[in-house]
Structure formats: structure tokens, C-alpha cells
Amino acid sequence: VVEDWKQSKHSQKGVDCAVCHGDKHYSKETVDKAEVPRPERCGYCHGTQVKQFKDGKHAKAWSSLKAMPTFHMQPMALMDGMKGCGGCHKIGIKTDDEVKELRKQGGQFGVASCDSCHTRHLFSKKEAQQPQACQTCHMGIDHPQWEMYSSSKHGVRYLLKQNGVLPERAAAPTCQSCHMTGGNHGVRTAWGFVAVRLPLPEDKKWAADRTTILKGLGALDPSGKETARLGVLKELDVFRTTQEDWQKERDRMFANCRQCHSPNFARGELEKSDRMIREADRLLAEAIEIVAGLYRDKILAKSQYYAYPYPDLLAFHDAPTSIEQKLYLMFLEHRMRTFQGSFHANPDYALWYGWSKMVSDITEIRKMAADLRNGKKGKRR
């Protein structure tokens, strides 16, 4: 810890331990007196960055985690213990009470948010500017952006620059080039995490498909009426809820693409990715409707954890039946890869890890539903 700090800009500028941790901890007997730094403490010197951060989606990561309908069912070591979801979602802003509770459970380390990217105790700006700073969290089943980026031409060129193969001035964007342009810490995207938005599109078929997906997310009830969960999702900024907000983020990304590409190319690539979402939505909506039909016809019994007799995509791996387990993977793994791979310039991910898997999923879901309707016993987890 001390050696890291000695090599940091903080050390050079005279920002010592007491500036961040207070002056009440001065021996091993007073460890409990050390203050846990929060973004507000960083804001004393880095006010602009903290304000930007609070306007972005990273600041809402902890609240988003807590809002998931089956959060309370998970092993606490995974959540508050930071060994699962909490390990990345800890970047989000936490209340004083939440920090106190985390401290009781030994999960107080790394709750400062800023240190998720500027790791302690170097707190290096240069570190946080590298794409590898994003790798720990933006990888894996539902958001493999690192895998997509690092094997795309964007990523390959930058990694070759890091290795000295390409010249220093070679064009090669990082995650930060596109998502944190100019060092802006207010990270947001037009389509959000789950690639839905409001208002509904003019395309009637796509509008119907998106309505079905919103029902699956619990934002609408089975009859199409808005639910309390929609209010929560809006508050957490999970997706854009006005055309103006969506357009603002699209224009920002378009301007980023224009730093290297022509307007026609940049616009065309973004619009092709939009169309990939539309195609993926068609398959996912059909799958949701198939499972919803099983609930409607009482072939599946409503889970005690569900608000309605309707599949809940946000139940994730706690989905109660085998067919819903397949649906959850179709949504969280394969649809994500279809549209994320497209936006991250990785055709292999968009096709073989995404779209191809969705086609297989819908084929299996149709067969599983037919078996259930033909009287074969459905497996409940």
C-alpha cells in the first residue's frame, strides 16, 4: 500500500493518508477509525470528474444490482461479499448505511467507486486510460465487450500499439476513446444495457416485439400496462425513455466515430447495428410469447417469486423451469452478444456467439413447449 502510494501523483503532490482516510487512525489499535473514502472525498480535488461520474451509468451500478428481483436469493458472498455481482457493481454510489453494513461484513474495500478503474493506491490516470482497465468487469456471459473489442480490428490495432508493433500515432481507439471521449466520466449509451428504449418504433412488428420484451422485463404487465418496475428501471437509467435522450447519445457516438471514419460509413455501421437489434428482438419476442402461452394455458404454474404468470427475464439463473432457463440464456447471453458484437465491430461474435445461438435457442424452445403441451412433464428447478 505504502509503496504504491509513494509512486503515485498523490505522493508527489503531498496528498497523504490523512487527506483521504482522516486523521483519527494513527496506530493498529485505531484501524476502525480510518474513514472509508467515497467519491465525494475525491471530489474535493476532482470535482468535474465526480460530477460527470454521478451523471453516468456506473454511478447507478450498485442500486441496479440491489433492484434485481432475485437479489435477496443469492449467496451474500457473491453480492455484499464482492465475490460475484458485487465485485463489479461496487463501482456504484452507496448510501452511508450501505457502507456501514458492508464494513461490518468485511466488504468495505473498494467502495470508493473511483478506485474501480484507478486502482489503489497508485490511483493512476494512465492505468484508467487503458482498455485493460475495463476488462475485469466488461467480460463474460452477458457483457463480453473485452472479448469483442480485443479481437476486433479496433482492439487488435491498439494492442499492437501497446506492444510497439504499430507506431505510436497509428489510429487505434480504446474503450475510453468511444465511451469516455475527452475524459468525460459520464458513461452512457444510446441503447443502454438491455437494448430497449422508448418510445416504441414506428415499425409495427418491431413495436410489438419490443412491447413483448418490456413485458418480459417486468416493465409492463401481461396486459401491457406500466408497472412499478418500469419506474425503477427509469430511475436507474437502464434504458433511454425519450427520443431526445436516445438521439443525444447516438449523436455523441456518431461524433466519436467521425474522428476516424466518414459520415456515411459511421452512420451506416450504427444503423446496421440497430437493425441487428430488430432481428434479435423478433426471435426473443417469439420465445417469450411461447413461454407466456404456457403460463396462460396453465401448463406452467406461476412461481411464488413472480408478480404475474409470465416469464421474468430479470430472474436470470433463478428462472424456475427448464424452458425458462433456456429463455434466460437466449436473452442474457446470446441476444446481448448479437447486438453488442455488432456495435463493437466483431462480426464473429455477432454471428456465431450471438445470432446463431439465438436461432438454436428458439428451435429448442419450440420443441420444449410442444413436448409440454403434449403432456410430457416439465422440469422445475
Spans of model-derived segments:
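Active-site neighborhoods of enzyme catalytic cores
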Residues: 86
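Intrinsic low-complexity, intrinsically disordered regulatory regions enriched in Ser/Thr/Pro
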Residues: 17-18
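Primarily the internal scaffold of c-type cytochrome electron-transfer domains
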Residues: 2-12, 29-82, 91-379
